[in-house]
From Swiss-Prot:
It is an enzyme of class 2 (transferase). Gene3D superfamilies: Vaccinia Virus protein VP39. Exhibits S-adenosyl-L-methionine-dependent methyltransferase activity. SUPFAM superfamilies: S-adenosyl-L-methionine-dependent methyltransferases. Belongs to the UPF0677 family. One of its GO terms (molecular function) is methyltransferase activity. The lineage of its organism: Bacteria, Bacillati, Actinomycetota, Actinomycetes, Mycobacteriales. PANTHER family: S-ADENOSYL-L-METHIONINE-DEPENDENT METHYLTRANSFERASE YKTD-RELATED, S-ADENOSYL-L-METHIONINE-DEPENDENT METHYLTRANSFERASES SUPERFAMILY PROTEIN. This is Putative S-adenosyl-L-methionine-dependent methyltransferase MMAR_5323. InterPro entries: Ppm1/Ppm2/Tcmp, SAM-dependent_MTases_sf, SAM_mthyl_Trfase_ML2640-like. Its EC number is 2.1.1.-. It comes from the Bacteria. S-adenosyl-L-methionine binds at residues 132, 161-162. One of its GO terms (biological process) is methylation.
């Protein structure tokens, strides 16, 4: 379903369902022979949600039991799992690196089913603020409580749509804008219109004193090319058709949730505003972690840049 200005969702709908897809990929990676990451809660979320498009990623036996379907989408599923594994490792290492510099205030924007507040070894005194849609945070908190999980940092949930005045909600919840902060915007930007992307980073910039850190993944140049968009839509439609034969549930058109618009280059913008930023392509990240690089651009993972930035003292 195409996006609207004030749309909202539960964990199994719209953008919320993509969080389950990410969790399913993390579960599959965690349970693989040589995992890049360890996320013990990913499987918990997937099992709590029941069957859906995410089942294709979380349950390899589904594909193994249907070889004619596996031949169509098996490689694409593996590509998605590899991408999510390397993405997760990138952000895990970012947060632990920021903590090593003494940062004790963390903000995870559009946290979805991110479980870093429960699974990373945060230093004593760390406060983690998580922002997302109310029903998404409710599902995550309730599911983890039912399994006896306890945060490894002081956790503050802020149920809010990021199209609203989230900086005010963050400040009202105890966030200290005078302290260095580690920010993440993981898997978020492509779901925002271009102007909303600009506003997001303007707000982060305003709330970030010297010593702050930022990590995000953003659409790579060419993301909005009409021919590439068309080919990606066709490929995703084939994947949905195959998935629909594995689980008896309608597959949402995830690509319709993206905004294929020309955007401000984030790393350049940050550099112009006092940050030291670097960008890594998804292909470079896959290579760094020893995962194969897809030989085409129209698969389930659009061209992506991973940006990390630090604001030094003036």
């Amino acid at each position: 379903m195409p996006r609207t200005d004030n749309d909202s969702w539960t964990i199994t709908e719209s953008v919320g369902a993509t969080a389950l897809g990410v969790a399913a990929a993390r579960a599959a990676e965690t349970e693989s022979e040589n995992p890049l990451i360890e996320d013990p809660f990913a499987r918990v979320f997937v099992d709590a949600a029941g069957d859906g498009m995410w089942s294709m990623f979380a349950n390899p036996a589904l594909l193994a039991g249907a070889p004619e379907i596996e031949s169509q989408v098996g490689a694409r599923v593996r590509q998605m799992i590899d991408f999510m594994a390397t993405r997760t490792a990138f952000f895990d290492e970012f947060f632990l690196g920021a903590a090593d510099t003494g940062v004790r205030q963390v903000v995870i924007l559009a946290s979805g089913l991110d479980s870093r507040a429960w699974r990373l070894p945060w230093p004593d005194g760390t406060v983690v603020y998580e922002l997302d849609q109310p029903r998404v945070l409710e599902f995550k908190s309730a599911t983890l409580r039912q399994h006896g999980a306890r945060p490894t940092a002081q956790l503050v949930n802020i149920p809010i749509d990021l199209r609203q005045d989230w900086p005010a909600a963050l400040l009202d919840s105890g966030f200290d804008a005078s302290k260095p902060t580690a920010w993440s915007a993981e898997g978020l930007v492509r779901y925002l219109p271009a102007r909303a992307q600009d506003l997001l980073f303007e707000r982060i910039d305003t709330l970030s004193p010297a010593g702050s850190w930022l990590a995000t993944n953003v659409p790579q140049e060419g993301f909005s090319d009409p021919d590439l968009v068309r080919r990606q839509h066709e490929e995703m439609q084939r994947m949905r058709a195959a998935a629909g034969r594995l689980v008896e549930i309608q597959m949402p058109a995830v690509e319709d949730l993206w905004y294929a618009e020309e955007r401000t280059p984030v790393a350049d913008w940050l550099g112009e505003h006092g940050w030291r930023a670097s960008a890594t392509t998804s292909a470079e990240l896959l290579t760094r972690y020893g995962r194969p690089v897809p030989d085409d651009a129209e698969g389930p993972v659009p061209p992506t840049l991973f940006v990390s930035a630090h604001r030094p003292a003036a």
